[in-house]
Amino acid sequence: MDSIQESDVLNAVKTKLPPCCLRIFRNKIILVGTYDLDKSTGYRSGSLDVFTMDLKLLCSNNTYGAILDLKLSPFDDTLICTAHSTGNIMLWRIRCTDKDDFQSNELDIHAIANLQLFEKDVLIASCHFSPLDCKKLLVTNTAGEAATIDIRTLSVQFTASAIAQAYSKLDKIDYEVQGATEKVIHVESGQFLKPHELECWTAEFGSLQPFQDVVFTGGDDSRIMAHDLRSKEFIWSNNRIHDAGVVSIKCSQPNFRNNKPTSIITGSYDDNIRSLDLRMMGESIFPGANVPTVNKLACDLGGGVWRFVESPIDQEQSHHNGSDRLLVCCMYNGAKVVTMNDNSDEYFQIQHYLKKGHDSMCYGGDWSNSLIATCSFYDNSLQTWIV
């Protein structure tokens, strides 16, 4: 990487609370989830902050539980899900004009549902919208569990507005959490039958055949697992591939590695990004535990490989050279843009990176059409940069 010039920072700002995750909405605003620990009480709280693309704070929505992850629905990007340290997820609605040329000060964000999935001392580590089923949501937690829920809607059409109406009609109960009383909706989740032995940090829906009914999970037990989405039964696991916890997974999608439908990308605390060929998993085969992969490739990124975000479709079209690109948040080693190319001697190649301004754990990042936004935790750093 010595020959690669570090990318230039466009804008930088210090957030009020430590930023843990972020997403960019329609190339117009940056949504940031924050996580703060009160050491005197042990209570964790956070906020959903909204920034312009030049990092001016538009508004901040305080949450009684810290935010560990946030995602936008691929079916209606005005629907946000946030994962919290208090066993709950929250659904939010962005209200703005339907046109992409809206001004950032013309939008409004408000919570539409507070769903209690687990006990209040369980942290929800990640949340994921299904790429195939608009109502399906996947979560993981620090008790080692992964589960799905079905999002309620009163309309045939899946919209944030219809979801808000559906949850507004449900009874809320008083719930004692962190010394306060909050209004929540208790939701029964469909848990996968085989949990991880330690924290389940991440998960991913399969997208392409034959994995369209498979969910992959990664845990602090160094184990990568596959589960049947329909029956919730265990399919396959391996704890001999990674030398530390598995914290990020990326499956092939129509716009990402679509020529490798049986391959997944993983990231671990052991600093390595890996490509795993899982062709040994047939459509009706349950291989069991520690069955080796057909093939694996690895690259040391010099920091824990915490999060993957694939390049936007329009950027991939302009970048088109037979390779796929990921933004990788590398914890204590900043963020990197990594390409994957079958036509190269080295499958993984670092194309761009940013370390300056991220003197702490880089946990969150996303792309817009023109820039990348990343955040790091203990130094409260939010930055934008170009590649």
Swiss-Prot record:
UniProt xrefs under SMART domains: WD40
Q: What SUPFAM superfamilies does this protein's entry cite?
A: WD40 repeat-like
Disulphide bond pairs = none
Say what the protein does. Answer: Catalyzes the demethylation of diphthine methyl ester to form diphthine, an intermediate in diphthamide biosynthesis, a post-translational modification of histidine which occurs in translation elongation factor 2 (EFT1 and EFT2). Also plays a role in the regulation of the retromer complex and is required for the recycling from endosomes of plasma membrane proteins like CAN1 and MUP1. Identified in a screen for mutants with decreased levels of rDNA transcription.
The annotated subunit structure for this chain is: Interacts with CAN1 and RTT10.
Mark the WD repeats by their residue spans. Answer: 62-102, 119-159, 195-237, 241-286, 357-387
Is-annotated flag, keyword Iron-sulfur? no
Coiled-coil annotation: which residues?
Answer: none
A Gene Ontology MF term for this entry? protein methylesterase activity
Its EC number(s): 3.1.1.97
Q: Which family does it belong to?
A: Belongs to the DPH7 family.
Reactions listed under catalytic activity? diphthine methyl ester-[translation elongation factor 2] + H2O = diphthine-[translation elongation factor 2] + methanol + H(+)
The pathway is: Protein modification; peptidyl-diphthamide biosynthesis
Instruction: Kindly provide the name given to this protein in its UniProt entry.
Output: Diphthine methyltransferase
Q: Which organism is it from?
A: Saccharomyces cerevisiae (strain ATCC 204508 / S288c) (Baker's yeast)
Miscellaneous notes for this chain? Present with 2640 molecules/cell in log phase SD medium.
Name the GO terms of the biological process aspect: endocytic recycling; protein histidyl modification to diphthamide
What UniProt keywords apply to this chain's record, in alphabetical order? Cytoplasm, Endosome, Hydrolase, Repeat, WD repeat
Q: What happens when the gene is disrupted?
A: Accumulates diphthine, the last intermediate in the diphthamide biosynthesis pathway. Increases the interaction of DPH5 with elongation factor 2.
User: Mind telling me which GO cellular component terms the entry cites?
Assistant: cytoplasm; cytosol; endosome
Cell compartment(s), UniProt: Cytoplasm; Endosome
Keyword Membrane on entry: no
Stored InterPro entries? Diphthine_MTase, WD40/YVTN_repeat-like_dom_sf, WD40_repeat_dom_sf, WD40_rpt
